Amino acid sequence: MSTSKLVVAMDGPSGTGKSSVSRMLAQRLDARYLDTGAMYRIATLHALRKGVDLTDPAAIADATAGLPWSIGTDPAGEQVLLDGEDVGEEIRGDAVTKAVSAVSAVPAVRELLVAAQRRLAGEAERIVVEGRDIGTVVIPDADVKIYLTASAEARAQRRNAQNLAEGRGDDYAAVLADVQRRDHLDSTRAVSPLRPADDSVLVDTSELGIDDVIGRLLLVVSERTGAGQ
């Protein structure tokens, strides 16, 4: 396998298997892994803990300006800290999930975190960067750009199954409504709306297992760069 510099931009909406796929792809490529969505979730948790009015962009910007956070890039395990506390589980909770679109839409928050994302990606020799605007905004010159997609129904089924596995109850209708709500917010926001880059490779995961997805992506990386095989 080539050990040359490699940046893979992995974009797409929630529920496409993006996080699991990105971690596994990074491991197969002997690369680092950056979950930019976790960064926005850390900022959201911080704003919630501060009691910030989430309808006030200026207040959100002020609260997150000195965000005391850190995030690891080891694909074998997540490390996300807020004020030195491991918040990996808390940032995946319902409160953060419902609020993250509002926080991530604030231009000052995006500016702060995009700068950090570029720095972390630049420090790595090889890295898979996962998010929603990596190929369009954060790293538009990435070596490989991939956009994972799936139907809203397939994504809701996956998230509902995850909720059941984690003991959060069975409410497919509510999960589907939330998926559709987030899709609308993310695709219509003024700053960095969710969309594939013009030169992204689109992969629909609705009917694919994770091994099938990884196989396709390794082929894409190999075709684009010569790495991955």
From Swiss-Prot:
This enzyme's EC code(s): 2.7.4.25
GO terms of molecular function: ATP binding; CMP kinase activity; dCMP kinase activity
Top-level taxon of the source organism: Bacteria
Keyword ATP-binding assigned to the entry: answer is yes
Q: Which reaction does it catalyse?
A: CMP + ATP = CDP + ADP; dCMP + ATP = dCDP + ADP
State the InterPro entries in the record. Cytidylate_kin, Cytidylate_kinase_dom, P-loop_NTPase
Enzymatic class: transferase
* Binding positions for ATP per the UniProt entry: G12, P13, S14, G15, T16, G17, K18, S19, S20
Which UniProt keyword terms apply here?
ATP-binding, Cytoplasm, Kinase, Nucleotide-binding, Transferase
Q: Per its UniProt record, what CDD domains does this chain match?
A: CMPK (cd02020)
Q: Where in the cell is it found?
A: Cytoplasm
Give the matching SUPFAM superfamilies. Answer: P-loop containing nucleoside triphosphate hydrolases
A single BP term in Gene Ontology: pyrimidine nucleotide metabolic process
Which Pfam families does this chain map to?
Answer: Cytidylate_kin
Q: Name one GO cellular component term.
A: cytosol
Q: Which family does it belong to?
A: Belongs to the cytidylate kinase family. Type 1 subfamily.
HAMAP family the record matches: Cytidyl_kinase_type1 (MF_00238)
Name of the protein this chain belongs to: Cytidylate kinase
Source organism (scientific name): Rhodococcus jostii (strain RHA1)
